[in-house]
């Protein structure tokens, strides 16, 4: 079994793979102050309550956009699984040509998503990841990572409205039935959700123009992907586990090197 970690600014998503099959997944809050012992305990409990044995884990791979948390997670991996985790970053085999001005500037999460999407759906394609930030990534027909756009996440936008406007409440993010609303809460929900749908549709439309492909697939992932996809025809597929699948694919591309490295050590 392979354990994968997708570490975002808000949540850490963990997945357990047996071959290509995702057999279990969990989500916990990203906590920079949590110690390696605390993370190890939480992971051990997940395995225990789901009838999985930590001793069956053959290897670990981590993708993170939060550098401050890496020491705790790497140390937790050493304690639980007696091995150094594979970290997605410089020097790792991705199998993807990154056409960015400085490839090191591309977030690991964006590359992981692009690899999974191209492997599963082919190209050209656009990936929209609804996370703390919403990222738009373009992949060519030949599987090249072309770049993309980054905008504030829908929750960040919602919280900013609540924090900066004294009389406006914090609202639940749901898909409103109409745009012309008759109370403050519904009006905010309509403005946030439909405004965000408009943002997505406009960016996707312009990316398709630049790609010179009106037929390229648009894949959505992330916690709020279903909410936004339900209100627009711009999104073709919602793939909740795209990042986890990408990590498993990257691990497989680096498996032989890992085995050789472990034998030498």
From Swiss-Prot:
Keywords: ATP-binding, Coenzyme A biosynthesis, Cytoplasm, Kinase, Metal-binding, Nucleotide-binding, Potassium, Transferase. The keyword Heme does not apply. Its cofactor is NH4(+); K(+). InterPro entries: ATPase_NBD (IPR043129), Type_III_PanK (IPR004619). One of its GO terms (biological process) is coenzyme A biosynthetic process. Belongs to the type III pantothenate kinase family. Catalyzes the phosphorylation of pantothenate (Pan), the first step in CoA biosynthesis. This is Type III pantothenate kinase. It comes from Alkaliphilus oremlandii (strain OhILAs) (Clostridium oremlandii (strain OhILAs)).
């Amino acid at each position: 079994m392979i354990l994968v970690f997708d570490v975002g600014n808000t949540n850490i998503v963990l997945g357990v793979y047996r071959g290509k099959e995702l057999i279990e997944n969990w989500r916990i809050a990203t906590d920079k102050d949590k110690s390696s012992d605390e993370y190890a305990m939480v992971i051990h409990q997940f395995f225990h309550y789901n009838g999985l044995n930590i001793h069956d884990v053959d290897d670990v791979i981590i993708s993170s956009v939060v550098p401050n948390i890496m020491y705790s997670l790497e140390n937790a991996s050493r304690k639980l699984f007696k091995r150094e985790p594979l970290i997605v970053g410089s020097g790792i085999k991705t199998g993807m040509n990154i056409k960015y001005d400085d490839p090191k500037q591309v977030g690991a999460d964006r590359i992981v998503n692009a690899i999974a999407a191209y492997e599963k759906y082919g190209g050209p394609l656009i990936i929209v990841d609804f996370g703390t930030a919403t990222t738009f990534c373009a992949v060519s027909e030949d599987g090249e990572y072309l770049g993309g756009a980054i905008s504030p996440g829908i929750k960040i936008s919602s919280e900013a409205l609540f924090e900066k406007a004294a009389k406006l409440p914090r609202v639940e993010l749901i898909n409103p039935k109409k745009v012309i609303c008759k109370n403050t809460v519904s009006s905010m929900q309509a403005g946030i959700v439909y405004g965000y749908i408009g943002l997505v549709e406009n960016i996707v439309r312009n990316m398709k123009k630049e790609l010179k492909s009106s037929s390229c697939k648009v894949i959505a992932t992330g916690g709020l992907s279903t909410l936004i996809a339900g209100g627009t025809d711009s999104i073709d597929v919602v793939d909740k586990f795209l990042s986890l699948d990408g990590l498993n694919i990257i691990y497989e591309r680096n498996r032989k090197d890992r085995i050789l490295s472990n034998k030498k050590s």
